[in-house]
Curated annotation (Swiss-Prot):
Localization annotation: Lysosome membrane
Pathway in which this enzyme or protein is active: Protein modification; protein ubiquitination
Residues annotated as binding Zn(2+) 1: 719, 722, 733, 736
Protein name per its UniProtKB record: GATOR2 complex protein WDR24
Species assigned in the record: Homo sapiens
Name of encoding gene: WDR24
Biological process terms in GO annotation: autophagy; cellular response to amino acid starvation; cellular response to nutrient levels; negative regulation of TORC1 signaling; positive regulation of macroautophagy; positive regulation of TOR signaling; positive regulation of TORC1 signaling; protein K6-linked ubiquitination
Cellular compartments per GO CC: cytosol; GATOR2 complex; intracellular membrane-bounded organelle; lysosomal membrane; vacuolar membrane
Record field: catalytic activity: S-ubiquitinyl-[E2 ubiquitin-conjugating enzyme]-L-cysteine + [acceptor protein]-L-lysine = [E2 ubiquitin-conjugating enzyme]-L-cysteine + N(6)-ubiquitinyl-[acceptor protein]-L-lysine
Length: 790
């Protein structure tokens, strides 16, 4: 539903009139740009390149620049810009690396003017000089920026950022020779177009790629940047070092940022993924947007204010194949729906609570704050309802500190430092982490690690030490669970299909259910008895312990060297009366070498005590390997990880993700994993656990997280002869013209891993130095020092 409010703005000799409206495009848009008279807008994408007139009630298509029968990659646009001095001049950045200029004044249908094919990869951004009509700047995925003079066929200068791909370039509005560029590795560089050999300034602005930047139209040194770290930062470039003035935290990666005209502290942003809305922020209030536009149903790819002196109209293009004009007055204001109370936990468990002064005063009986009344009320300026600060407000802040010794976050630090996340078999990792959690008093976490070991490890990998059973009253003995029981001196007189009879309704809790007079029934009528119907030999169930397992009675596999444990006879309570009295022990001993008796040969068999020393059990091997596959528990493990994350224990969620790896990764979406990883890494860095943080990044199963160590890293190299910084060229000093980092063996520049002696400071390629020191202990540089490689 289109909103019908209308705004008329007088700008010099022209008048802008319009309302909130949109039109459907033939294809998704990648970028938009507005003509200098604010009457037309150009929309460019992979399959669209059109100019629309902005009329009072609607958009009207004026010109389709995709002409010709054959489709060309030169028309597949990643960016478009309309010259602000010449209304007939446009430039596009093609996905095949070509920069194309267009002259709308040409009489033919084809308006294409010039093609520049010097870039080797996709061109991400093109930008005209704000005051020089013939200067065009481009930034490409190949890491180079090129400055073109439209009166020539080739570029006049090339700028190399010595970095990864260039994401955005913008000429400064106030400084004639200055432009800013943003890079994939999180750096921002400032260049002078007269000096293409080196940048004037470089600093790390974001943790990850910097997708966009924009110079402030009024303040000379203000530069806004947005990146994948979901932040918008405002930098003061007038100081010796770039100073961060404001930081706005958004909910998704920032794809575009544009300062709002005539509003010094307002800027508009849109996201690269997930979030489809457009936000207008007041950088002085970075937590709640001043305005929000919700018209698009897919990712917004381009935004532009309609006129450089009109803050009321914002144009946008989207992947939902729509072009919209937003009226600022029609925007929703999230501050009206925001919770007026704030709650936050500190690093060490302190709790801060902020609420409106009026609410706190009502509870405590104090008089609420009424604002500054030094000036009469009739001098008060009437505020615009569109402004985010509509009135005076005051909040009360309460801080609740944790009691000394009453908890804290020491467990978090100890757990992070002691957890084992890699380098061992899965069973050992789970056991180690369970032990750590148990020693720290976190029994639920310890039990979770134990269950993960049981689910994902085969029975043979489970240590027997943790699965011993306490039997009898007089003491305890170790009976490894994953083995079968062998009754000492027991004759093999029971059939292979004999099953243990469990009486229905028998309430058994903490007793060992191997009765000296327990009856084994082989009747076919025993199908309704409780227990397992697995076709095995003799089943023995309900042994007291941590798990309820079934075991095989196999006298042929008895091992005399197995550890045995004497079980007192009173440990086996009588279950029921003996159905039939079997022959005595002597009879069983006489037939110890006879074959097993089948079910047809003996209808009823029983186990009778031989003497007081008969209750000897030993363990040899598992009953059967019929286990539920680990994938069966995937949903359960996923819910468990979500439970810990929702409880605030993101440490447990990330640790399990790393330890289980691909076993559980497929059950949790990539965005959730990335959120858990970044939250845990942020906590580790707050506690200054840098080594653990680095290990988590290296072991991460999320691609977006594992590349964090490869970004925002700057290595400063000085010449080893004259000590001059070598920032412009990689390996040659500008002053003494000598190469740095020469290998003492091959006398070539080392451009990779460099190893040197701490005694004499000579070194070279790692493999060369290792091979040299295998045959000689003296330095290869000839200094006479005895070097050693360790």
């Amino acid at each position: 539903m289109e909103k019908m409010s209308r705004v008329t703005t007088a700008l010099g000799g022209s008048v802008l009139t319009g309302r909130t409206m949109h039109c459907h495009l033939d294809a998704p848009a990648n970028a938009i740009s507005v003509c200098r008279d604010a009457a037309q807008v150009v929309v460019a994408g992979r399959s669209i390149f059109k100019i629309y007139a902005i009329e009072e009630e609607q958009f009207v298509e004026k010109l389709n620049l995709r002409v010709g029968r054959k489709p060309s990659l030169n028309l597949s646009c990643a960016d478009v810009v309309w010259h602000q001095m010449d209304e007939n001049l446009l430039a596009t950045a093609a996905t095949n690396g070509v920069v194309v200029t267009w002259n709308l004044g040409r009489p033919s249908r084809n308006k294409q003017d010039q093609l520049f094919t010097e870039h080797k990869r996709t061109v991400n951004k093109v930008c005209f000089h704000p005051t020089e009509a013939h200067v065009l700047l481009s930034g490409s995925q190949d890491g180079f920026m090129k400055c073109f003079d439209l009166r020539r066929k080739d570029s006049v200068s090339t700028f190399s950022g010595q970095s990864e791909s260039v994401r955005d370039v913008q000429f400064s509005i106030r400084d004639y020779f200055t432009f800013a560029s943003t890079f994939e590795n999180g750096n921002v560089q400032l260049w002078d177009i007269r000096r293409p050999d080196r940048c004037e300034r470089m600093f790390t602005a974001h943790n990850g790629p910097v997708f966009c930047c924009d110079w402030h139209p009024e303040d000379r040194g203000w530069l806004a940047t947005g990146g994948r770290d979901k932040m918008v930062k405002v930098w003061d470039m007038t100081t010796h070092r770039a100073k961060e003035m404001h930081c706005v935290q958004t909910i998704a990666s920032v794809a575009r940022v544009k300062w709002r005209p005539e509003c010094r502290h307002h800027l508009a942003t849109c996201s690269m993924m997930v979030d489809h809305n457009i936000y207008v922020w007041d950088v002085r209030r970075p937590f709640v947007p001043a305005a929000m536009f919700e018209e698009h149903r897919d990712v917004t790819t381009g935004i532009a204010w309609r006129h450089p002196h009109d803050p009321s109209f914002l144009l946008s293009g989207s992947k939902d194949s729509s072009l919209c004009q937003h009226l600022f007055r029609d925007a929703s204001q999230p501050v009206e729906r925001a919770n007026p109370e704030g709650l936050c936990y500190g690093l060490f468990g302190d709790l801060a609570f902020a609420a409106k002064e009026s609410l706190v005063a009502a509870e405590s009986g104090r008089k609420p704050y009424t604002g500054d009344r030094r000036h009469p009320i009739f001098f008060k300026r009437k505020l615009d309802p569109a402004e985010p600060f509509a009135g005076l407000a005051s909040s009360a802040l309460s801080v609740f500190e944790t009691e000394p010794g009453g908890g804290g976050m020491r467990w978090f630090v100890d757990t992070a430092e002691r957890y084992a996340l890699a380098g061992r078999p899965l069973a050992e990792l789970c056991d180690h982490n369970a032990k750590v959690a148990r020693e720290l008093g976190r029994n639920q976490v310890a039990q979770t690690w134990t269950m993960l070991r049981i689910i994902y490890c085969s029975p043979g990998l489970v240590p027997t030490a943790n699965l011993n059973h306490s039997v009898g009253k007089g003491g305890s003995c170790g009976l490894p669970l994953m083995n079968s029981f062998n009754l000492k001196d027991m004759a093999p007189g029971l059939g292979s299909e004999t099953r243990l009879d469990r009486s229905k309704g028998d309430a058994r809790s903490d007793t060992v259910l191997l009765d000296s007079s327990a009856t084994l029934i082989t009747n076919e009528d025993n199908e309704e008895t409780e227990g397992s119907d697995v076709p095995a030999d003799y089943l023995l169930g309900d042994v007291e312990g941590e798990e309820d397992e079934l075991y095989l009675l196999d006298p042929e596999h008895a091992h005399p060297e197995d550890p045995e444990c004497v079980l007192p006879q009173e440990a086996f309570p009588l279950r029921h009366e003996i159905v039939d009295t079997p022959p005595g022990p002597e009879h069983l001993q006489d037939k110890a070498d006879s074959p097993h008796v089948s079910g047809s040969e003996a209808d009823v068999a029983s186990l009778a005590p031989v003497d007081s020393s008969f209750s000897l059990l030993s363990v040899s091997h598992a009953l059967y390997d019929s286990r539920l596959p680990p994938d069966f528990f995937g949903v359960l493990v996923r819910d468990m990880l979500h439970f810990y994350a929702e409880q605030g224990d993101v440490q447990m969620a990330v640790s399990v993700l790393i330890v289980l790896g691909e076993r559980v990764r497929k059950d949790i979406d990539e965005q959730t994993q990335e959120h858990w990883y970044t939250s845990y890494i942020d906590l580790l860095q707050r506690f200054r656990l840098w080594n653990v943080s680095n290990e988590v990044v290296k072991l991460s199963t999320s691609r977006a997280v594992s590349c964090l160590n490869q970004a925002s890293t700057t290595l400063h190299v000085n010449c080893s002869h004259c000590k001059r910084p070598m920032s412009s060229r990689g390996w040659v000093c500008d002053r003494c013209h000598r190469c740095a980092s020469m290998c003492a063996v091959c006398h070539h520049v080392v451009k990779g891993l460099f190893v040197w002696c701490q005694g004499c400071s000579h070194g070279g390629h790692l493999q060369h130095i290792m091979k040299w020191l295998e045959g000689s202990s003296h330095c290869p540089a000839g200094c006479g020092h005895l070097c050693e490689y360790s």
